[in-house]
């Protein structure tokens, strides 16, 4: 290992350091997210291949046991770590009102587009959405909150350090870090870990000249009195300390001091690991820190120590550092890699990231956010929040608007930003009753947001073919509605069958239909396409247990899906499955007046 710093830190501007920290965190997040066990990756690609090739597309299982479905994550896309860094950064643009904007706007809105969010942060954000302080909620919620000691705080506080990069004192930054942290986490492990990490990032932003080997760890250890105190938050959230005492008695400050001692012990282990020089001891040190221990690996203190260690260890070879973090299988890889990337970027700027700096999701937007924070004159000290507190009704209105929208439609997102619908994703369901759809929205500022809706499919809605589905088609409508001309290129009826072998024999041998095409999962006989009920299990059902999966679907291939969609909407026919893209085809499904499913398809390449 090369222990010399290969970068001349004197030549790196503060803006470049800020952009490097933001992008380094995002790149580490995107590299590490597929590797963490909690991501529930199901495509089982080879990790070594990914490590050498950089970003790759992957598939995760989402929805838990009740709404299971698969979700495709595109190469370079980031998770909640980067989302929450950006939430913090946007809040800081509101000057002294940043904390109120964070709890009233950013956290409640985040509940609608979060990807991979941690339990404590999601619970707290839902409480803010309901207008409740997590530390003032019902007893059960309050206890959960004060037991939350994970890394969800440390992962998002880097913007505070960048905004205060030229400050000569860490005190105000420390206060803001804890004020940010208590919005979601109440245990000292979350807050002390965030303070130690924040101090390391602050040191990295301020560092110029030659960086000594292991210097960052040494500074965090030697300056413990500058970052380890529990700040007074009375002027920000006056009820917090009272709740902390109510739940923990007078012991909260004792727990805090024990946690500081724990943090120092972890950092001492890191310092010891640095003494091994060129020897490859990363796995050994990360193991000693607890990074692979299921019960503590997500702790704020453990993650802070791991990221400070890896950033110190690889200061001379920074990209190797986030790869080491991102592919430490069994650890909380996305957060460790993101936090490691934040420190390394604060030291070395952007250059070390290579093409990853351009290929990570929303790269230009991320750079712009760092640039905005660096231009302090653009911050309005008492800027009024863009809108009042976000409530559930705001988010419900957003969903209603999305369900009515078409690709390309523009409207205001819940946080006041203008967004455009850029894609509609129909997720692969892993159960017969789960329907999962996501809208990809692109904000005018450049951020990509995925908003998902999960629902239950009601078989009775389709199975009752004897009941006409209500469509607003009066005699006048039929006679006078002007509809666009539809050019049909092909047509078939899709039959879901219980036994492919028997059905093929019947249609091919008994009825004489020629098999024109076939694959592992379907057989096309003329204009009839046979599809198995369950291509994996090939389950068989009695006639008494038929479900909606047994219905036939009329498939019509057209030149322009948009024309047909417009006609269907104009006459008020029901859209059963919204427009989605799969394997080069665009398609949606509507219902005819008698409840028959009609799938409209357009080949797009």
Task: Show the residue positions of the predicted features.
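Short amphipathic alpha-helices within nucleic acid-binding modules
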Residues: 503-506, 562-567
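N-terminal beta-strand motif that seeds the catalytic metal site of vicinal oxygen chelate
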Residues: 480-502, 552-554, 604-605
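Amphipathic alpha-helical segments
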Residues: 499-514
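Vicinal oxygen chelate
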Residues: 481-486, 565-605
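Short secondary-structure junctions
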Residues: 423-427, 512-518, 574-579
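Conserved short beta-strand elements that form part of the metal-binding/catalytic scaffold
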Residues: 514-548, 597-603
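Short acidic/glycine-enriched loop/turn segments that link adjacent beta-strands
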Residues: 519, 550, 582-586
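Structured, active/binding-site neighborhoods that engage oxygen-rich ligands
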Residues: 1-481
